[in-house]
């Protein structure tokens, strides 16, 4: 399979997993002040549907092309480590750039959930990275 198509599919799979984890977080009442879809919607005219599409485009296309581009020419290896690294970089960008764009302090430390925001989002992005790398490995090895 073309490595870029594999990357986009892997990104889509990883975004589904992250979205489910975010949904479970909300259902359990954890960090109610941190709703990334609502935050994106607030910058895109208020539509949560459009924000969810944007979230999936970033996860699928952005991260998918990212892992495919970073994977190089040797596609006969395991890309989980690369996926974790990409997840970490995505988390760091979110914490130092996206949060301020959303009107929050870096790392979201001004939010009521405080230190839970960077810790929980780091864990989510690392899980995302594992799924991204594992799915990409499976797809490019077909």
Residue ranges and their predicted role:
Residues 1-142:
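Juxtamembrane/disordered regions of integral membrane proteins
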């Amino acid at each position: 399979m073309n490595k870029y198509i594999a990357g986009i599919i892997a990104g889509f799979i990883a975004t589904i997993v992250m979205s489910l984890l975010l949904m479970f977080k909300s259902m359990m009442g954890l960090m109610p002040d941190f709703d990334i879809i609502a935050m994106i919607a607030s910058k895109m005219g208020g539509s949560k549907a459009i924000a969810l599409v944007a979230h999936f485009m970033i996860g699928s296309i952005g991260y998918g092309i990212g892992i495919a581009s970073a994977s190089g020419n040797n596609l006969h290896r395991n890309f989980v480590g690369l996926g974790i690294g990409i997840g970490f970089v995505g988390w760091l960008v979110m914490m130092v750039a996206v949060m301020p764009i959303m009107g929050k302090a870096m790392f979201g430390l001004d939010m009521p959930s405080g230190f839970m925001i960077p810790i929980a989002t780091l864990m989510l992005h690392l899980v995302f990275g594992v799924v991204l790398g594992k799915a990409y490995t499976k797809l490019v090895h077909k």
